[in-house]
Amino acid sequence: MLKVPLSDVLSQKMLFLKSFRYFHCTKYFSRDNASSTTDIFRNAMKRKRELANLKEQSHGNVARNAAFPKEYIKRPKQVPRNATNRKKILITWSTGTDRAKEAANSVVSEIFKKNHKGNIKVVDPTTHRIEASNIRYFAKGIDLDKVGLSIVNVEQIDNENQIPLVKIVESRVALKKYSDFLAKKKEKELMELGVLNKSYKNLVTDKKEDNLKHIKISWQIESDDLKRQKAHEIVSLLKKGNKVTLYLDDKNNINSNNWLENFEELDRSQKGEPPRLPESVFQKRAAVLETLKEIVSEYANDPVLLGNMNSKMIMKLIPKDVKPQNNDKRALKELRKKERQEKLQKRIQRKKMNEM
């Protein structure tokens, strides 16, 4: 009989037990827990397949839109065309003083604010027609020692873009307009800082502007409107002691945004005469001017006329008498009564002259 040492037997048993030391049977496999185990496995496999399909769909254009709707896709916002942080476009001027260059650059900057491409409309000095252009090309060759730029009107194209109407004016006119622009800008800054009160601004404007009234009249105005509405407006201002300036021009020009700038050059003598109008148009304008003279003859001194009927005119009116204060009601009534009597006498005299 083979005898095995007891130590060898014990060591073999220990090796056999060590091979099963990591196996722990905590729950028996039965019908009750089989369904739950299967569900866990099935859900895990289902989730794995969904992730795989989603990954494949993300590589396709059509499937990608289905997997990621547009509302969940973040795209960088596009910068609008007329953004304020756009690089400034400067034009180099070879002529003119520093002040003239600043005035021209101010106009160019305003043009690009209204139209980011710099598209403009210009008035041809020879044909007097409005033509399309671009400020980059239009500004070439301009002698700032003699002339300057001015925006006389703005045409609205859409919500973002506008087309300015640019005109070449004398250098002194451009500098005067630029000085006014800087003065208004400085005044606005002082008011924002609280240094300048609105009452001071009103006090200055009261002395300069309140006593001078501006009325624009179209050459195409109807006779009834001129004799009623406009006549009442003009006479009322003259009776109050206000100085009145009448501006007569074509309907298209008088209704523009910067209509007043068209009259800046009438104070100086113009070179050459404007083109002659048809006889019917000229007679219509002559009738308008004569009617205005008749309306203001009783309440204003002899009017000062500038310009001519072929283009535009200015009529400056100064009231004859200074009316008394509002608190002197009796004197005011007597004055109105006297005016009515004088007016009635003139009508009677005109009627007698017509009968003769």
UniProtKB/Swiss-Prot annotation:
Q: What happens when the gene is disrupted?
A: Increases frequency of mitochondrial genome loss.
> A GO molecular function for this record?
mitochondrial ribosome binding
Q: Can the keyword Mitochondrion be found in this entry's annotation?
A: yes
* Chief place where the protein resides: mitochondrion
Q: Which GO terms describe its biological process?
A: mitochondrial translational initiation
What are the subcellular locations of this protein? Mitochondrion
Give the superkingdom in one word.
Answer: Eukaryota
Q: Which GO terms describe its cellular component?
A: mitochondrion
Residue range covered by the transit peptide:
1-32
| Keyword hit for Calcium | no
User: Keyword annotations for this protein?
Assistant: Mitochondrion, Transit peptide
What Pfam families does the entry give?
mIF3
Other comments on record = Present with 319 molecules/cell in log phase SD medium.
What family is this protein classified in?
Answer: Belongs to the AIM23 family.
- The protein in question is named Altered inheritance of mitochondria protein 23, mitochondrial
Query: Species name for this entry?
Result: Saccharomyces cerevisiae (strain ATCC 204508 / S288c)
